[in-house]
Each structure stands twice: as C-alpha cells, then as structure tokens.
Amino acid sequence: MIEHPKTKGDRTALAVMIALQDAGFGVALPFGENTRYDLVIDDGRSLARVQCKTGRLREGAVRWNACSNYAHHANPRMAQRDYIGEIDYFAVYCPETSGVYLVPIQHAQVRTKGSLRVHPPRNNQRRLIRLAREYEIGRVDIQPLNARVAG
C-alpha cells in the first residue's frame, strides 16, 4: 500500500520533534499551515524557523527536496519554490538511517535538492562535502503502522 504524502510528512515531523526535544531544544508549532516553516525551536537564547523534510538514503547520501513543489496546483505561478531566506534550518529525518539531521540553511544554500554524505565519496572528494554525522542530533525509529503489524 502506498503511503499518503501527508502521513509521511507527519511521521517525519514527529521524529524531528522527538529528536529536538531530546537534544534540549524547546519546540513550538505555528498556528495553521500557511507558514513556510513547520516548527520553531528555542535554544534558550533565540528562536529559529525549521522546515521538516523526509530524507532518503541514495548512493551513500541522505537526500531531500529543498524546495516546495506547486506543479500539482491548477495554475501555479512557479512549479518550485526554495526556502532560502524563509527558514533557518532544515530538519531532515531519514527512515533508512533513523537519523535526524539539523542543517542550517546557510550550509544548504540549494534550490532543489539537499544532500548529506553518510559514507565518504568513492573518489575521496572532500571539498563541498557535508557529512551527515556532523549534523545528526539524534536517532528515532518510527515505522508506519502497517510495517509494525506485518513485522
């Protein structure tokens, strides 16, 4: 059975909130769904806007969409819209690694796809490589209900 994207996003937000709270952050939710961010975090000194994203492990890296897609709307002004200048962090949950990664937007100035390396690249490239372990704030294993029942 194919999972509804909203359900997948809710599971990601839950994993992120658990990891943030365990890491010592205060977590608040904005009212409504018309903000460009999903959460607000409080580190005791300042507040920051966080966009939650589901990452997928592909070719040794956790990859996520670093933009919103509007192509499914009737007459979108733009098919994609990035988050640069509108959030402070991406919080990425990857079910395959159970990792939650908090990535400052200035470390992910990308318009479409974000990426964190889980394994070093085979060509030994070091420049412009972001290692997942440097951004990991916790591990949370949240499986879909049908996976828990079947397993």
Give, region by region, the residue ranges found by the protein language model.
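Mixed-charge (Asp/Glu-Lys/Arg
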Residues: 1-35, 41-151
